[in-house]
Structures are given as structure tokens and as C-alpha cells.
UniProtKB/Swiss-Prot annotation:
Signal peptide: none annotated. GO terms for cellular component: cytoplasm; nucleus. GO terms for biological process: abscisic acid-activated signaling pathway; defense response. The keyword Cytoplasm does not apply. It comes from the Eukaryota. PROSITE patterns: PATHOGENESIS_BETVI (PS00451). It comes from Apium graveolens. Belongs to the BetVI family. GO terms for molecular function: abscisic acid binding; protein phosphatase inhibitor activity; signaling receptor activity. The keyword Transcription regulation does not apply. It holds the Pfam family Bet_v_1. This is Major allergen Api g 1, isoallergen 1. Keywords: Allergen, Pathogenesis-related protein, Plant defense.
Amino acid sequence: MGVQTHVLELTSSVSAEKIFQGFVIDVDTVLPKAAPGAYKSVEIKGDGGPGTLKIITLPDGGPITTMTLRIDGVNKEALTFDYSVIDGDILLGFIESIENHVVLVPTADGGSICKTTAIFHTKGDAVVPEENIKYANEQNTALFKALEAYLIAN
């Protein structure tokens, strides 16, 4: 099995605590308001804590339509969130899973930095192409910025 790691850092004027609340704790109610149409449907199996599964269907027409996320850990005090993508066409047929570690770090100006480390576990010696990582970064950044704008407005 191959392993590939990628880090995405996004800055925000919104506090780390408020981003964490919207991005992690209340994401299932906030994201549909912040980015209507980002998801076609989300089926949740569990209480939102570790072991919870989120089966996500994305809108028609995109290159990715399905993914299943497993919540691995939520730490409200440390502002960390761990989850894995374990199923769906997002895995492209050559990725076993994508392990994600999210840390919200407060900044001196009252804002925050959202640091996401994605660890791609690939089949054999497969390598995730750079264009796929770029596409994921663009999608994740757009969702983060939509969430940030919603939190600022509300």
C-alpha cells in the first residue's frame, strides 16, 4: 500500500472556536445554509461522535458523486477533528482510504488557521495525480470560504 500526504492551510478572520463549531459540530445544519446545493443528500448513521458514518451524495454532473466519511475523533478543547473517507467514487478505484486530520489554530488577531492533513492510502504503488489533489483543494477551499462567509453574516 502506498501513502501520500498533503497539507492544506486556510486562514480566516473568524475565530477558531466559531469555525470549529460551524465546520465540525454544527456542519450538518450550517453547511446546507452556507453552500446550498453542495450536497444532494447526506445520510447520517450514528450520533456524530467517533464511528459515525456520513454517506454523502453530491450533485449530478461533477466528477465525484459519492463518498462515505467515518468520524474518527472530535476534540472540542483542542479544536481537532479526525475523519476518514472510506468508500465512494471519490476513491477513484485506486485509493483505499483518505485519512484527514483537521486542526483549528487561533491567531493573534482573533482569526484562525484551519490546517488539514490528508493522508491518501493507495492500492499498490498508485500515486494520486496532482490534478486530483488540486481539484480537492479547490472544492475544500470553496466550501470553507462559503462556511466562513455564512458565519460572518450570522
